[in-house]
Design a protein with these regions (language model features):
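A generic N-terminal leader/anchor concept
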Residues: 1-44, 176
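Conserved beta-strand/loop scaffold segments within soluble protein domains that form the structured core
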Residues: 25, 37-42, 46-189
Length: 189
């Protein structure tokens, strides 16, 4: 099942407790972004259809994602740039997702000696769905990526994420999950 025909006309309430940049995804699809706290030429965020260069021949969820992916985002931090503020990914799931499968793909690239704090903030309207995400993360030499996943409210969704990529010499990838309750959450690295 694809979620291309789902409509969205709500205003997402952004966190106002601290300054941050953001990416908005609705049902896995890239909607908008704002990087007002960063140097525009040092950070690139665009919509991504799917991960064309990734190949996982023994993973059926990968084939499902490749066939039905509606998008996601590509984020790149330029060489020697340390992001001044975190980027929050507002991952919003609408109420009309019952028995739907969300397939999305994201790609994150940190060039040499760069730093980024990424917060994935999941918000759900109580529908039962399956989220199938494939993420390619490349962290070049001397770079640092801190990834924090926060589940705002209890969710009836089933979350699967496959993370692949390259971590270069003297680089660091830190991942934290703060959940208020999920039916199922599996992350494969």
């Amino acid at each position: 099942t694809n979620n291309d025909d789902l409509k969205f006309d709500k205003q997402i309430k952004l966190i106002d407790d601290f300054e941050h940049n953001y990416i908005i995804l609705v049902n896995g699809i890239f909607k908008s972004c704002d990087i007002k706290y960063e140097e525009k030429k040092k950070l690139k965020i665009v919509s991504l259809k799917s991960l064309e260069e990734l190949s996982l021949p023994n993973n059926n969820l990968y084939y499902l994602n490749k066939a039905l992916s509606l998008g996601g985002f590509f984020l790149e931090v330029q060489k020697d740039y340390k992001c001044k503020k975190p980027i929050i990914i507002y991952n919003y799931f609408t109420s009309d997702l019952d028995n739907k499968i969300i397939n999305n793909s994201n790609q994150i690239k940190l060039n040499q000696n760069s730093e980024l704090t990424l917060i994935e903030y999941n918000m759900s309207e109580k529908s039962k769905f399956f989220k199938n995400t494939f993420e390619n993360i490349n962290i070049e030499q001397g770079s640092l990526l801190k990834s924090i996943t926060i589940q705002k409210n209890k969710s009836n969704g089933y979350f699967y994420k496959n993370i692949s990529g390259i971590q270069d010499y003297n680089s660091s990838y830190q991942s934290f999950i703060l959940s208020s309750g999920l039916k199922f959450n599996k992350i494969e690295i």
